[in-house]
From Swiss-Prot:
Domain of life: Viruses
Domain Helicase ATP-binding: 95-240
Induction: Expressed in the early phase of the viral replicative cycle.
Name the record gives this protein: Probable helicase D10
Protein's gene: D10
Coiled-coil boundaries: none
PROSITE patterns named among the record's database cross-references: HELICASE_ATP_BIND_1, HELICASE_CTER
GO terms of molecular function: ATP binding; ATP hydrolysis activity; ATP-dependent activity, acting on DNA; DNA binding; four-way junction helicase activity
Keyword list, A-Z: ATP-binding, DNA-binding, Early protein, Helicase, Hydrolase, Nucleotide-binding
Pfam families, per the entry: Helicase_C, ResIII
Residues spanned by motif DEAH box: 193-196
SMART domains given in the database record: DEXDc, HELICc
Domain Helicase C-terminal: 289-439
Amino acid sequence: MKVVISNKAYFKPDDELWDYCSKQTTYHIETMTSKYPIMYKNSGVVAKEIKWIPITRLDLLDAKGIKYELVDKRTLAPVDIPKPKFKLREEDQLPIYEECDDTCIINGKPGFGKTILALALAYKFGQKTLVICTNTSIREMWAAEVRKWFGFEPGIIGSGKYNIDPPIVVSNIQTVNKHANNLSKVFGTVIVDEVHHCVATTFTNFLEISCARYKIGLSGTLKRKDGLQVMFKDFFGYKIFSPPVNNTVAPTIHRYSVPVELSGNQNVPWALRANDVYNHPEYRETIINLAHLYVNMGHKVLIVSDRTELIQTILEALTQRGVTTYEIIGATHLDDRLKIQEDIAKGGPCVLAAAQSIFSEGISLNELSCLIMGSLINNESLIEQLAGRVQRIVEGKLDPIVVDLIMKGGTGLRQASGRMAVYRNNGWKTITMTPEKAVQLAKIAFGNSS
């Protein structure tokens, strides 16, 4: 039997083999909100006899003892990529670089240096490379790394630009999808940052049409709340590199009880119940006071929230108290974001309040040392991603702190219990901040005048 691989693996199976392959690439995912499992299918019919499965699932044919002739029509686009100026760490990055020779996932915690390793692999494979990012901020971070380590200007797709001439091109996923057909056979290597999003429609659209010879997925977590991580192998195969945790400091979790109830009334939409918490004066005052406390202790504090009005209210109050503040939200211009990050890195203690969607993934501002989660979070991977923003090692930086706010009521306590399980699983120290401990901390921050 002949199997042709390009963007997918195309073949002519008999009914028995196709029934097996079809079942093995069909997933039934249980959800909390649906009475029945949701079905996802990652195989299909091209014509009466021609079927397709993911390239990375040829193991299904091997499992049935099928002998086949492989015709590889994937894109190879050799280019000269300059040798990068960085040096890989021998204890964790270099072994992966030496072993990696095909499509795979690199599952490294924040601080591991996934960006550097991926750029090294782009150099190793020597193929015209496309880096796909979740947003423009991360895209600009990748572009800056290419300039810094390779000494050339990368191509950019997005923000009104379409330059695919350089050997490395960086784009955000939304723009790539618009040009998917034209780009499907241009690149020999595709690197997908924050690959845990890859089973979302916006990512699968391009991955399913791309004929790139090498596909590399990067992520700090391979967990998804919806369970769709079972499909990762259909896009990046079974090879997963999970390096040990290095180059980071484990945070200490300071847990504060907030006298605000999170309603458990299922008849009220979640967004409205969350709004009741976010709009509560006690909740807002708690975040303001804690941000003021930790900045006075010398921290560079990051507050994340998914409510712009809450971010702006908190920053206004802190500014009135004389605290140096910064804001990064969706409306913040890209150049302004970069300038803010530069000012924070060079400056003293401050508070940065930012949109959670921007800072939950990939933004590297290593000088941040304290995280205040200003949203109601009950998602293991999101907690780990956010905590990673303050875990990176920088000379002179204070030991990282993550501030956990515990709401009243059964729902609030259940969420707090879920977050506590994440902290335990990661081996992070937790401290319950009783009123007495909070007073002691305030005396350290503000002196006896507090």
